[in-house]
Amino acid sequence: MEKTDTIILSPEELAAYMAESTISVTSTYEHSPVVLMVGDTIIGTLGNFSASIGKAKSKKTFNVSAIVASALSGSTVLHYRSMFPENKRKILYIDTEQGRYHCQLVLKRILRLADLPECKNPDNLIMLALRKFSPKLRLAIVEQAIGAIPDLGLVIIDGIRDFLYDINSSSESTDIISKFMQWTDDRQIHIHTVLHQNKNDEHARGHIGTELNNKAETIMQVEVDKENKTVSVVEAVHIRDREFEPFAFRINEEAMPEPVESYLPKEKKTGRPTKGPFNPDKEIPKNVHRPALDAVFANGNISNYDDYIERLKEGYGLQGIKLGYNKAVKVATLLSDKQMVIKEGKDYAFNPEYHY
């Protein structure tokens, strides 16, 4: 069971929060200013956050570089357009995955896309490389930067996973997304973050991916084209505005992203696709089972079959594998056949020494 923080406030403090949060029918509230678009489609407003998701090597960081270059220059880059107010022109770029050398390559790429000189630091862009710090310290540094940088309008966080110790922790995920909502509202900024997708499906990874899907203004997917591996395709998978037409880009000889103007979006097939019976041995990657079973048996052995099936649905769901009852039964059969789960009397027990 995950611990939850207990907030103890005085009645006066709670009353002040209530007053701040009360909506009045006679008051005037401004619509969130639009700051990022793809063509004529809104993907980002001040006071909200968005995300890019994609599998490894799908060119997510190249895509984000184009977003930043558009915001930095105020021009169209790839298909991104930006219109940040004059008092919201500062950009904070957080990289949690790469070292200083590779972060500098990203910075130079952004400047070239924005037609700015590489010989001096840009006035409106600050990049922080936080790879060496712990998740808790990374979060504290970002919170300090967001609160201290004047005229801040756009924050890039590449990637959000490195703010968490456990990507499947519901409490950690809720805390991070709550921070995003607080920062964007208090500072009236837009945050764009990056998260990997599961290897075996299109879902954003872990519980943090679920929280992003539920709360983000826009989720864009960056995917390598199935017919041409040199091309990456960007499309909206969750969006409050109307969907934009998917577009494609490739990396040219100068290691810069450039649009593929000849790309034609694939037609989405209507109706339910034909699919054979569920085969967990083939459809669930081997490396998913151990973390899933760690979650299933987190509280020890399970004595009831129905409880066991429900826990399988929950444990595999945390790994991005959605199971209904019938599929969970097939998974239970596989686990028994492979001696990954064994019977101890009437109990179901995890066998950590299994070989698969």
Where are these regions (language model features)?
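Alpha-helical scaffold elements adjacent to nucleotide-binding pockets in ATP/GTP-utilizing enzyme cores
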Residues: 66-67, 102-110, 141, 145, ...
